[in-house]
């Protein structure tokens, strides 16, 4: 997300590289007098998002993992998991990697077929390849399917995170569950 309050961002009127082109010589237009839409300018403050670049981290016959390239180091990284359930069905999960923890947002609505297999592949990858300490899932507390989600994720080994946990943000409208990964045990295997 772009911080529009950042004082280091110059107003567009003061950025020489973003000035409109003017007719320098008579004849055909060398470039348009109209400015480019702000959403198309990297770092622009338009309503659209800048297209993010992503790098392939891992790929096998079922699982593909990509990561958005960070603009600034020190910021959380966005990781995308795609698990091929069948030739035509893909289970997709977006996550944020921050401080040795992976945060996975459960999208609103019904989970797609194959979501369980995709989540299990995500957990295995997070433990074996990413070496994270925790995988957190989060979803809105007001969801109609909250009870079945709690039951399903509890069955998979997730535990409810109590308010005030140091690893999660204070969000009263969001439910967090955690899957702790004991890296000491996995290193001994």
UniProtKB/Swiss-Prot annotation:
InterPro entries attached to this UniProt entry: Acyl_CoA_acyltransferase (IPR016181), ODC_AZ (IPR002993), ODC_AZ_sf (IPR038581)
GO cellular component, one term: nucleus
Superkingdom classification of source: Eukaryota
Keywords for the protein's UniProt record, in alphabetical order: Nucleus, Phosphoprotein, Polyamine biosynthesis
GO biological process, one term: viral translational frameshifting
Chain positions with Phosphoserine modification: 186
Protein family membership: Belongs to the ODC antizyme family.
Function: Ornithine decarboxylase (ODC) antizyme protein that negatively regulates ODC activity and intracellular polyamine biosynthesis and uptake in response to increased intracellular polyamine levels. Binds to ODC monomers, inhibiting the assembly of the functional ODC homodimers. Does not target the ODC monomers for degradation, which allows a protein synthesis-independent restoration of ODC activity. Involved in the translocation of AZIN2 from ER-Golgi intermediate compartment (ERGIC) to the cytosol.
Subunit structure: Interacts with ODC1 and thereby sterically blocks ODC homodimerization. Interacts with AZIN2; this interaction disrupts the interaction between the antizyme and ODC1.
Record's protein name: Ornithine decarboxylase antizyme 2
Source organism: Mus musculus
